[in-house]
Amino acid sequence: MNLWLLVCLVASLMGAWSTVHTQGVSEDCCLAYHHRARPRLLMRAQGYQRQEVSGSCNLPAVIFFFPKNKMLCVNPRVNWLPNVFKFLDNRNNTHSKQHLGSRRNLQDSHLGGQRSNTGMSRLAHSKSKSSRSTRSNKKKTSFLNMANPGP
């Protein structure tokens, strides 16, 4: 009888473990809006993504991505939000049109708009700046491609 009880206990713990383990894989989504967001702040974002209601995300939102993996959730019904979308789309399209088909558009966006017009290679340009260390070398580029993925 004790063996049967032990088997039932182990089986129930294994079932509970898989449930607890899969909860950690849930979606990253906005659960509340940031009500103090203003257009000037949002125009400094690296990109944005629209969040639709699905799964555990029960709130429609727009997620703005900033340096150092910071995010800000905004209500999509705010009346000035289309102006911010237009500004970010124009800024990101300008970078991608200048370096179409190359990986330099991600690197150049971290230079703060400084570009080499002399035709120097990226390596030569970085060697000329190696005497000073900038924070832009440490930024992550994972969110730069996320500008306007939605309709």
UniProtKB/Swiss-Prot annotation:
Signal peptide per UniProt: 1-22
Q: Which family does it belong to?
A: Belongs to the intercrine beta (chemokine CC) family.
Lineage: superkingdom: Eukaryota
Task: Note the SS bond partners.
Answer: 29-57, 30-73
- Protein's cellular compartments: Secreted
Keywords recorded for this protein, A-Z = Chemotaxis, Cytokine, Disulfide bond, Inflammatory response, Secreted, Signal
Pfam families found in the cross-reference section: IL8
The GO terms this record gives for MF are: CCR chemokine receptor binding; chemokine activity; chemokine receptor binding
Kindly indicate whether the keyword Signal belongs to this entry.
Answer: yes
Bias class Basic residues marks the residues at: 124-141
* Cited function: Potentially involved in T-cell development. Recombinant protein shows chemotactic activity on thymocytes, macrophages, THP-1 cells, and dendritics cells but is inactive on peripheral blood lymphocytes and neutrophils. Binds to CCR9. Binds to atypical chemokine receptor ACKR4 and mediates the recruitment of beta-arrestin (ARRB1/2) to ACKR4.
What organism is the protein native to? Canis lupus familiaris (Dog)
Question: Which GO terms fall under biological process for this protein?
Answer: antimicrobial humoral immune response mediated by antimicrobial peptide; chemokine-mediated signaling pathway; eosinophil chemotaxis; inflammatory response; positive regulation of cell migration
Q: Name one GO cellular component term.
A: extracellular space
Q: Where is this region: Disordered?
A: 94-151
InterPro entries in the cross-refs:
Chemokine_b/g/d, Chemokine_CC_CS, Chemokine_IL8-like_dom, Interleukin_8-like_sf
Name the UniProt record assigns to this protein: C-C motif chemokine 25
Major subcellular site: secreted
